């Protein structure tokens, strides 16, 4: 399903709706930037939670993110703490270097992936592994079977014609 949204705020709310986010889901954003998708997801789950025990579990166990840039990681961590996430499950590392099998185990099993990967990082054969499609494949391999994902990519990412792009799309 392809949906356009005019600004990031609307996309954050839209992502929650597209994946039919439930208070039992475990959210993962591997390119979390400032944490906007995680915060939107957390708030939606907290509103749907039945009691304080569920709300506490959501905050402490069900929100996970990775950000590679130190500056953005600092902002994301601050944003999550200011919004009362309880225990910031964010790490400052390279998502593509993470083992998808280990990521699947976070919080009891990642059921929802949100992602706005860095654009236009693949400039040639040496950096083909940095394409938006490679990020999508790695995300899909990192969520549990039956999980859902919402991803923002430029249209050009979906019409890539290189052999590498075609192979990744086939894999996805």
Task: Give the predicted meaning of each segment.
Residues 10-112, 120-122, 126-129, 133-134, ...:
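Conserved S-adenosyl-L-methionine
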Residues 127-172:
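Conserved Class I SAM-dependent methyltransferase catalytic core
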Residues 1-5, 9:
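Single conserved hydrophobic/aromatic residue that forms the stacking wall/gate
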Residues 4, 30-33, 144:
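Generic detector of intrinsically disordered, low-complexity, polar/charged segments
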């Amino acid at each position: 399903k392809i949906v356009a949204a005019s600004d990031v705020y609307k996309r954050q709310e839209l992502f929650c709706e597209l994946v039919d986010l439930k208070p039992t889901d475990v959210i993962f954003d591997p390119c979390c930037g400032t944490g906007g998708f995680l915060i939107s997801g957390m708030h939606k789950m907290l509103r749907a939670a039945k009691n304080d025990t569920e709300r506490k579990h959501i905050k402490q166990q069900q929100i996970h993110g990775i950000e590679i840039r130190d500056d953005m990681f600092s902002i994301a961590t601050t944003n999550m703490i200011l919004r009362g996430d309880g225990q910031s499950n964010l790490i400052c590392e390279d998502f593509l270097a993470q083992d998808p099998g280990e990521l699947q185990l976070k919080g009891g099993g990642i059921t929802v992936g949100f992602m706005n990967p860095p654009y236009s990082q693949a400039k040639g054969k040496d950096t083909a592994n940095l394409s938006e499609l490679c990020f999508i494949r790695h995300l899909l391999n990192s969520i549990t079977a039956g999980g859902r994902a919402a991803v923002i990519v430029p249209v050009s990412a979906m019409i890539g014609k290189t052999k590498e792009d075609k192979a990744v799309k086939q894999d996805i």
